[in-house]
Amino acid sequence: MKSLRIVLYVLSVVFLTTGAFAKSLKMSRANWDTGYFHAEIYKLGLEELGYKIKKLKDVKPSVFYIGAAQGDVDLWVNGWEANQKAYIDETKGRVIPVGYVAKGGGMQGYLIDKKTAEKYNIKSILDIKKHVKKFDRDNDGKADLVACPPGWGCEKVITSHFEELNLGEFINPLKAEYSATLADTVAAYKNGQSIFYYTWAPNWIFGTLKLGQDVVWIHVPTKSRTKVAATNATMNEINFGFALDDIRPFANKSFLKNNPSAKKFLEIANIPVADISAQNFLMYKGEKSQRDIERHAKDWIKKNQKKFDGWITEARKFNM
């Protein structure tokens, strides 16, 4: 009996890896480019397990969670658990987290250039009100903030800050395509202008605008969170306004139940934040085509082959 089980296991591995009985898997990825790299690594891992995956469709969180709850999509690995909580809650338990891409890896907040912060003694986001002209690039009488597009979890948090602190009286949130707007901000900084933006880590921006050298985090006096010790900030302790978040895979609950091998892979795979940031900087430097991203992912796997193979071997044990 034991020999029969071994034979069946070996055959199942062969069939899955050769695609003889490959299952289709519907995977999406985030519509922000800093999430493309780890999505591609996870895609390659799932394909190694025998899943057939079409080209990943870029979607915003609000669209992903609705689709996953309805079974139109199976999973993505671009979940920010705290940031996207409102969308996650709306699925009523039909879409759940599994594993961690980067536990505690998602840092978020508002930054301004260090020179302006020090010259005008700007410590808090409320201090921007006294210096609107420094950040008003379109001359509408309000400071311009690079914010989040509609449908992103961070947009809801930023909106809550605007409502609680009446930020709309003196700040205009720019909600156009994020990467392009942020690139414009980098150009403005290089031209000597003051800058003000929301961002998160890991992100290519930190390879361009250095924390503590070019830019600093600023305090957000919201009641929803408390001050924490901070480096490269306007004070030794600030309220970032956002939770330190976990980047996680989220999947349809029924899919996970019916696909234990995929579930196990999602549980044990992970990508260091430093590696994600390094790849994001390559994209900023121009290596941003889909072919580039696929190459980056394959190169990462080669450099971490033993670890990657271990994930695959462990996940395959759950095919039976």
Predicted regions and their residues:
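Short, well-ordered beta-strand elements
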Residues: K23-T34, Y51-L56, K142-V146, L266
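Short helix-initiation/N-cap motifs at beta->coil->alpha
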Residues: W32-D33, Y51-I66, P173-D184
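Short, polar/charged alpha-helical segment
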Residues: D33-K52, S160-F162
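Ligand-binding pocket segment of bilobal, Venus flytrap-like solute-binding proteins
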Residues: G67, V73-V77, P149-S224
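Ligand-binding "clamshell"
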Residues: A86-G99, G192, F206-N236
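A conserved helix-loop-strand patch within extracytoplasmic ligand-binding domains
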Residues: I96-A147
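A bilobed periplasmic-binding-protein/Venus flytrap-type ligand-binding module shared by bacterial periplasmic
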Residues: Q108-E118, T231-N232, D246-N258, L282
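C-terminal functional modules
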Residues: F242, F255-L256, K263-M320
